[in-house]
């Protein structure tokens, strides 16, 4: 008796050669429905429609096709169980040996920012998950394929003989993972649409890559990624495989460069070009200029030692002039919206340099959550991507600031929230001069930033991610010649810092918003 394969797929990659091999080399009969059946018929592959097999028509505009006892009985019946086989024979139902199903493209559908409610709902598959779960449950008797990537390996095993129980069990596991991911994606989307809250289930993202190791060689690591968003859409043009640390640093780099309009630097010569250098997820240099190579060199001036082995992010296409500057350094990665051909040719001499193309649309469509594991659980929070606009800032000091000072303060404020707390940034004229990161006390971070800036701190501004618990940072800033400070405010000792500014001739802004980063 011929074996039966039930095939119903949304993703038709590899379908025709796979089905031809099943029928011509292995004698399978194929049952299929809808668009899959049409595709097989057009390729002259013998196929029986589900409607012909069940004797029941597709109804409700195709919502009900495979939900029928002749389908699910054939999938769920144990082939070694006499009672099950008796029931099949009595109802004239045949055993189904192979189920090939992948689901309506719900994740792809909702990745469109303009998707309608009705379109999203219509792309929730019902019959597909039911068949997948039925076949996976009865995997001792049925093989279940849910991904075109499985076709070739399955045919190789079929050519070598029967599909082993071990292989069927592995396919069943992958099938349940497939439906679990699908259901989580639906739950997450509906949670946001209906209640504007997080789904209780965190990720529907598949493993994109098993990484060589985690932060250290003794740690295992996997990269989970949405196919149609963010880094899942990034294109690596050159270089070694991305590591865990590369990805962490790239994320920090892009989060920082977005402050200055990712891809905005391509909008014309009048637009600011921005460059960010990251080391261990901290900015070690940030600058803006009307010239990209100048922006990079200004960023590099902030801390050229820490830039060694760092990651560079740019807010516009990398040109040849800037590529020449980059090629003189040892860097792990460069990320930009795109690359000029001459720039790629220059960087091609740096064989290990990872060159990443990340489009503006990839960033725009990406939904980000900040996720950290704790003992027995996971913490999930919104990403800190909201800034208080300058017109909402308050100036509690007697001395006000110039337009130029406000521009420098806004620049420093955009940088400091991407520096690990406690964080201090000293800046002037669109360039970071000193960055104090990750200190256990604020005055310690200020000392690092001010000492790094040195004489350049004279006439510069200082930004702090948190309030000043004491007035010591104001006094230290004054000694280095800082003329204006921006900080959240909110300390019970705010007045002490205000009085110190008034006494020492500094202006200060309270933004009213803290930006801790742990």
From Swiss-Prot:
<dbReference type="GO" id="GO:0005829">
    <property type="term" value="C:cytosol"/>
</dbReference>
<dbReference type="InterPro" id="IPR016193">
    <property type="entry name" value="Cytidine_deaminase-like"/>
</dbReference>
<dbReference type="InterPro" id="IPR024051">
    <property type="entry name" value="AICAR_Tfase_dup_dom_sf"/>
</dbReference>
<dbReference type="Pfam" id="PF02142">
    <property type="entry name" value="MGS"/>
</dbReference>
<keyword id="KW-0658">Purine biosynthesis</keyword>
<dbReference type="GO" id="GO:0004643">
    <property type="term" value="F:phosphoribosylaminoimidazolecarboxamide formyltransferase activity"/>
</dbReference>
<dbReference type="InterPro" id="IPR036914">
    <property type="entry name" value="MGS-like_dom_sf"/>
</dbReference>
<keyword id="KW-0378">Hydrolase</keyword>
<comment type="similarity">
    <text>Belongs to the PurH family.</text>
</comment>
<feature type="domain" description="MGS-like">
    <location>
        <begin position="1"/>
        <end position="146"/>
    </location>
</feature>
<keyword id="KW-0511">Multifunctional enzyme</keyword>
<protein>
    <recommendedName>
        <fullName>Bifunctional purine biosynthesis protein PurH</fullName>
        <ecNumber>2.1.2.3</ecNumber>
        <ecNumber>3.5.4.10</ecNumber>
    </recommendedName>
</protein>
<keyword id="KW-0808">Transferase</keyword>
<dbReference type="GO" id="GO:0006189">
    <property type="term" value="P:'de novo' IMP biosynthetic process"/>
</dbReference>
<comment type="pathway">
    <text>Purine metabolism; IMP biosynthesis via de novo pathway; 5-formamido-1-(5-phospho-D-ribosyl)imidazole-4-carboxamide from 5-amino-1-(5-phospho-D-ribosyl)imidazole-4-carboxamide (10-formyl THF route): step 1/1.</text>
</comment>
<dbReference type="InterPro" id="IPR002695">
    <property type="entry name" value="PurH-like"/>
</dbReference>
<dbReference type="Pfam" id="PF01808">
    <property type="entry name" value="AICARFT_IMPCHas"/>
</dbReference>
<comment type="pathway">
    <text>Purine metabolism; IMP biosynthesis via de novo pathway; IMP from 5-formamido-1-(5-phospho-D-ribosyl)imidazole-4-carboxamide: step 1/1.</text>
</comment>
<dbReference type="InterPro" id="IPR011607">
    <property type="entry name" value="MGS-like_dom"/>
</dbReference>
<dbReference type="GO" id="GO:0003937">
    <property type="term" value="F:IMP cyclohydrolase activity"/>
</dbReference>
């Amino acid at each position: 008796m011929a074996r039966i394969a039930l095939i119903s797929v949304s993703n038709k990659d590899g379908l025709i050669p796979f089905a031809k091999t099943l029928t011509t080399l292995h004698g399978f009969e194929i049952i299929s429905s809808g668009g899959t059946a049409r595709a097989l018929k057009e390729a002259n592959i013998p196929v029986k429609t589900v409607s012909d097999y069940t004797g029941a028509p597709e109804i409700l505009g195709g919502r009900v096709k495979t939900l029928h006892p002749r389908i699910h009985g054939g999938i769920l019946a144990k082939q070694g169980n006499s009672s099950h086989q008796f029931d099949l024979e009595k109802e004239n139902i045949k055993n189904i040996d192979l189920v090939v199903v992948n689901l309506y493209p719900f994740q792809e559908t909702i990745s469109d920012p303009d998707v309608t409610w009705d379109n999203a709902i219509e792309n929730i598959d019902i019959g597909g998950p039911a068949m997948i779960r039925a076949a996976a449950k009865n995997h001792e008797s049925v093989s279940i394929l849910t991904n075109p990537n499985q076709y070739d390996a399955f045919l190789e095993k079929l050519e070598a003989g029967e599909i082993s129980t071990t292989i069927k069990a592995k396919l069943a596991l992958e099938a349940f993972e497939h439906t679990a991911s699908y259901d989580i994606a639906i739950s997450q989307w509906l949670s946001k649409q209906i209640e504007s809250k997080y789904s209780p289930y965190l990720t529907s993202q598949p493993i994109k890559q098993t990484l060589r190791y985690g932060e250290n060689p003794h740690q295992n690591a996997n990269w989970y990624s949405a196919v149609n968003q963010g880094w899942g859409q990034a294109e690596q043009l050159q270089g070694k495989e991305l590591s865990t640390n590369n990805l962490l640093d790239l994320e920090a780099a892009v989060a920082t460069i977005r402050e200055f309009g990712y891809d905005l630097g391509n909008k014309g010569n009048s637009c600011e070009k921005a460059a960010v250098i990251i080391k261990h997820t901290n900015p070690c240099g940030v600058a803006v200029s009307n010239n990209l190579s100048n922006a990079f060199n200004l960023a590099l001036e902030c801390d050229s030692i820490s830039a060694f082995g760092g990651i560079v992010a740019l807010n516009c296409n990398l040109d040849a002039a800037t590529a020449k500057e980059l090629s003189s350094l040892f860097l792990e990665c460069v990320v930009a919206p795109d690359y000029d051909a001459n720039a790629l040719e220059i960087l091609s001499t740096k064989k290990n340099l990872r060159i990443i193309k990340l489009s503006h649309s990839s960033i725009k469509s990406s939904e980000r959550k900040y996720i950290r594991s704790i003992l027995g659980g996971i913490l999930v929070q919104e990403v800190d991507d909201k800034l208080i606009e300058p017109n909402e800032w308050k100036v509690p000091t007697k001395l006000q600031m110039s337009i130029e000072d406000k521009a420098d303060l806004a620049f420093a404020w955009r940088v400091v929230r991407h520096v690990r707390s406690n964080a201090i940034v000293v800046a002037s004229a669109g360039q970071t001069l000193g960055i104090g990161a990750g200190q256990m006390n604020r005055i310690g971070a200020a000392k690092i930033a001010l000492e790094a800036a040195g004489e350049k701190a004279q006439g510069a501004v200082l930004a702090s991610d948190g309030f000043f618990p004491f007035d010591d940072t104001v006094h230290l800033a004054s000694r280095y010649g800082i003329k204006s400070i921006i900080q959240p405010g909110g300390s019970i000792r705010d007045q002490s810092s205000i009085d110190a500014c008034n006494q020492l001739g500094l202006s200060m802004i309270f933004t009213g918003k803290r930006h801790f980063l742990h």
